[in-house]
Curated annotation (Swiss-Prot):
Family in the record: Belongs to the cytochrome b family. PetD subfamily.
SUPFAM superfamilies: a domain/subunit of cytochrome bc1 complex (Ubiquinol-cytochrome c reductase)
InterPro entries with a match to the protein in the record: Cyt_b/b6_C, Cyt_b/b6_C_sf, Cyt_b6/f_cplx_suIV, Cytochrome_b_C_euk/bac
Keywords for the protein's UniProt record, in alphabetical order: Electron transport, Membrane, Photosynthesis, Thylakoid, Transmembrane, Transmembrane helix, Transport
Gene Ontology biological process terms, A to Z: photosynthetic electron transport chain
Physiological role: Component of the cytochrome b6-f complex, which mediates electron transfer between photosystem II (PSII) and photosystem I (PSI), cyclic electron flow around PSI, and state transitions.
Name this polypeptide is given: Cytochrome b6-f complex subunit 4
HAMAP family: Cytb6_f_subIV (MF_01344)
PROSITE patterns reported in the protein's UniProt record: CYTB_CTER
C-alpha cells in the first residue's frame, strides 16, 4: 500500500535552511481531502449563510420605494450599469450618431492590443498608452454615469460649471 502522507526529507540542506528561517510548514502530510473538503468548508459555508440570513432578519431594509402601478414616474431611468449608454443616447442630437458612437467603443477596445504591440512590458507604469486609455475611459464612463442621473441641462457639466 502506497503512503498517502508526504513526509519531508529532513536530510535536505536546503529544507533545513528554510525551516531555520521560519519558511515552510511545521507540520507535513495533512491531506486536503477529506479534512478540508468534508469538515472545514461546510462549516465556513454554513457560517456565511447563517450570517447573511441573520443580518437580513435583524435589519430588513427595503430596496427602494414601494411601486405605485397607477402613477408613471417623471423620468424613467435605466439600471445603473446602463447610465453611460443612456447618457450618450440622451445628449447626442442624432440617434444614428449615438448608435455609431456605441459601436466605436468595442472597435476601439479591439485596437488597443495592436497599438500597444510594440511595448512588451506588463508593468502598467511602463505602458503609457494602455494606462492612459484605461484611465481616460474610467473617468469618462463615471462622468457619463453621474451625468445620466441629473437633469439634461446639467448632465454634461454635472452642475459644476
Amino acid at each position: 500500500m502506497a503512503k498517502i502522507l508526504k513526509q519531508p526529507d529532513l536530510s535536505d540542506p536546503q529544507l533545513k535552511e528554510k525551516l531555520k528561517k521560519g519558511m515552510g510548514h511545521n507540520y507535513y502530510g495533512e491531506p486536503a481531502w477529506p479534512n478540508d473538503l468534508l469538515y472545514i468548508f461546510p462549516v465556513v459555508i454554513m457560517g456565511t449563510i447563517s450570517l447573511v440570513i441573520g443580518l437580513a432578519v435583524l435589519d430588513p431594509a427595503m430596496i427602494g420605494e414601494p411601486s405605485n402601478p397607477f402613477a408613471t414616474p417623471l423620468e424613467i431611468l435605466p439600471e445603473w450599469y446602463l447610465y453611460p449608454v443612456f447618457q450618450i443616447l440622451r445628449t447626442v442630437p442624432s440617434k444614428l450618431l449615438g448608435v455609431l458612437i456605441q459601436t466605436t467603443i468595442p472597435l476601439g477596445l479591439m485596437l488597443i492590443p495592436f497599438i500597444e504591440n510594440v511595448n512588451k512590458f506588463q508593468n502598467p507604469f511602463r505602458r503609457p498608452i494602455a494606462t492612459s486609455v484605461f484611465l481616460f475611459s474610467v473617468v469618462f464612463t463615471l462622468w457619463l454615469g453621474i451625468g445620466a442621473t441629473l437633469p439634461i441641462d446639467k448632465s454634461l457639466t454635472l452642475g459644476l460649471f
